[in-house]
Curated annotation (Swiss-Prot):
Keywords: Nucleus, Repeat, RNA-binding. Gene3D superfamilies: 3.30.70.330. It comes from the Eukaryota. The gene is PES4. Residues 91-169, 179-247, 303-379, 393-471 form the RRM domain. This is Protein PES4. Residues 37-81 are annotated as: Disordered. One of its GO terms (biological process) is mRNA localization resulting in post-transcriptional regulation of gene expression.
Length: 611
């Protein structure tokens, strides 16, 4: 008969204008009978402590109102007396560390044994609708809420310990100064030390709002309601044996508290005997690789390992979760994302035996599709050198032939999309007629690629050797010798191997073929007949390539021979085997024919045969 709206019903509209005064009592009774449904709404907001999640959450039952207490019980009024506007203040609890399979129905089934239990909510990701791992409980009775918290806190639900604490909306109160106690060096590998045991141990000293253990670092936190209780616990347990292991404890200051302007003033007001947490494992200031201090936080220790080839999206939490499986971690240093396609890190374990386990277990292990390199970390000085080497890496080259000059090295790098910082040939050995030099690269990865390609490879008649340090006996460059006396073409296309470095990658089959002949192969083909045959074939190719209109006198036999000798000496370093391999490719590759043609034209011009 009556509709519910936001407007209060006018009592005058319910009274007839001609009603008699003696009918007043009857109208009142009729009114009470007719107004039987009157909703009372009591909203309970979630704990804003967990509002830092990236996405908003919603109830797993989206069709029902969240945290609404609706009184639609007809028995709510007795003997005709209206009680519909009465409401009780609910007691909210926060429940965390929920397994992903825990639903609101799961929680209702667990807490329904408490008569004053009203409702449960599991917070969900607004997009994926998956559990965020926490939720809220509502009780009508405070004593029953505390009883439920005491009985069920840190018990397992679907295989995971749940954590129940008061839902504190006041941030200042929740982070009450000096009540959060930090414990380090806890023996969390002891199966007897569970979170429930840890909770029971300290709850007898005072009310605990929350406690947590982290086996990845062997640390724990107990958040007391009272500051005096926290100080007493620290005095009793600091530097004492706990489950057979000496532990340390002190006041922990939350990051938000440490950032307030008057933090130091507040800290100075603490009791002089109060111990403040000194060990800040995985301190925030060391979380970024670009901090200068972070490069010096690792002492020379047998507890540290070096990890290379991590995916570029790796975070410190990823490393902590993955590498703590073998033992608790003390600290992590993760490099910044650079131009290279991987990250590297230093991880320091609390126990040296765990670092040994990590090397054996994780070296050559695939992590998110990348094969890891895990080794013993170097000492402080060596580590500093390595970090510096990531900026500019220098590769030293020895035993270079005249062919392997600066121009050749430049094109070699260009083909592989490598931009060297500097290329220099600065040494010459008179005995072997070879050169030495170095290439500076912008990163270690580029240097490694050229190192692997050139090391022990035959190029232009000499086997190149590469190293990360200059040889002590490396000959120095002399003005009387060196590449300045070797003819350098103004056309790079005619230099040996240009066609391979320009048209093919470092792994080109042509490059592998031309460089695959080792010294034993060369010794098998050291006879005059073979050399003569190759040179005769080469001279015929030179004769065919001479343009009579441009170089008329060059076609004479003696001049053809001179041009062929010039090319053989200048461009091929008198290497018969390499020249023979090149000639075998002429008929199958027009490009090779073009290279030889340009060599012939430049040689003829240099020798003065041009018209």
């Amino acid at each position: 008969m009556y509709s519910i709206s936001n407007k209060k019903p006018s009592i005058l509209s319910m009274v007839p204008l001609n009603i008699l005064k003696n009918q007043d009592l009857k109208v009142k009774k009729d009114q009470e009978k007719k107004i039987s449904f009157n909703p009372v709404v009591t909203p309970i907001r979630p704990d804003d402590y967990h509002e830092k999640t990236s996405r908003s959450s919603s109830s797993s039952h989206s069709d029902s109102p969240e945290f609404l207490r609706i009184n639609n019980n007809k028995s709510g009024h007795k003997n005709g007396k209206l009680k519909s506007f009465e409401s009780k203040k609910l007691v909210p609890l926060f429940i965390g560390d929920l397994h992903e399979t825990v639903t609101e129905e799961t929680l209702k089934g667990i807490f329904k044994k408490y008569p004053s239990f009203v409702s449960a909510k599991v917070c969900l990701d607004s997009v994926t609708k998956k559990s965020l791992g926490h939720g809220y409980l509502n009780f009508e009775d405070k004593e029953e809420a505390e009883k439920a918290m005491e009985e069920l806190n840190y018990t397992k639900v679907n295989g995971k310990e749940i954590r129940i604490m008061p839902s504190l909306r006041n941030t200042t109160f929740r982070k009450n100064f000096g009540t959060n106690v930090f414990f380090s060096n806890l023996p969390l590998n002891n199966p007897l030390l569970t979170t429930r045991v840890f909770y029971d141990t300290f709850s007898r000293y005072g009310k605990i709002l929350s406690c947590k253990l982290d086996s990845r670092k062997d640390i724990g936190f107990v958040y007391f309601e009272d500051e005096k209780t926290a100080r007493n616990v620290i005095k009793m347990y600091n530097n004492t044996s706990f489950f057979g292991k000496k532990i340390l404890c002190g006041i922990h200051f939350d990051k938000e508290v440490r950032s307030v302007p008057n933090f130091e003033t507040q800290k100075s007001r603490l009791d002089a005997e109060t111990i403040i947490e000194k060990e800040q494992s995985l301190n925030e200031k060391h979380s970024k690789g670009n901090d200068k201090e972070s490069k010096n936080i690792y002492s020379s220790s047998q507890n540290s390992i070096f990890i290379k080839n991590l995916p570029t999206i790796t975070t410190r939490d990823d490393i902590l979760n993955f590498f703590s499986e073998v033992g608790p971690i003390k600290s992590i240093y993760l490099s910044n994302a650079t131009k290279v396609k991987y990250l590297w890190a230093f991880v320091t374990y609390k126990n040296s035996s765990d670092s040994e386990k990590a090397i054996k277990r994780y070296n050559n292990f695939y992590f998110r599709g990348k094969k890891l390199l895990v080794t013993r970390a170097q000492d402080k000085e060596e580590r500093a050198k390595f970090i510096e080497s990531q900026k500019i890496s220098t590769l030293f080259l020895e035993n270079l032939s005249a062919v392997c000059n600066k121009e050749f090295l430049k094109y070699l790098c260009h083909q592989e999309n490598i931009r060297p910082f500097k290329i220099q040939i600065d040494g010459y050995d008179e005995n072997s007629s070879t050169y030495s030099g170095f290439i500076k690269f912008r990163n270690f990865e580029d240097a490694t690629r050229i190192f692997n390609f050139l090391n022990n490879r035959l190029v232009g008649g000499s086997i190149v050797t590469t190293s990360w340090e200059r040889q002590n006996n490396a000959p120095k460059y002399h003005d009387g010798y060196g590449m300045r006396n070797i003819h350098t073409s103004s056309h790079p296309q005619i230099t040996p191997y240009y066609q391979y470095s320009h048209a093919n990658s470092l792994n080109s089959p042509h490059m592998r073929d031309l460089s695959s002949m080792n010294s034993s192969t060369r010794s098998l083909i050291k006879n005059k007949n073979f050399n003569k045959k190759v040179l005769e074939t080469f001279e015929k190719q030179v004769r065919r390539g001479i343009d009579f209109m441009r170089f008329p006198s060059a076609t004479r036999d003696e001049n053809v021979h001179g041009i062929a000798e010039y090319i053989f000496d200048t461009y091929w370093n008198r290497d018969v085997l390499i020249l023979d391999k090149f000639l075998s490719l002429l008929n199958s590759s027009p490009y090779h024919e073009g290279v030889l043609q340009k060599q012939i034209e430049e040689a003829a011009s240099s020798l003065g045969f041009k018209r």
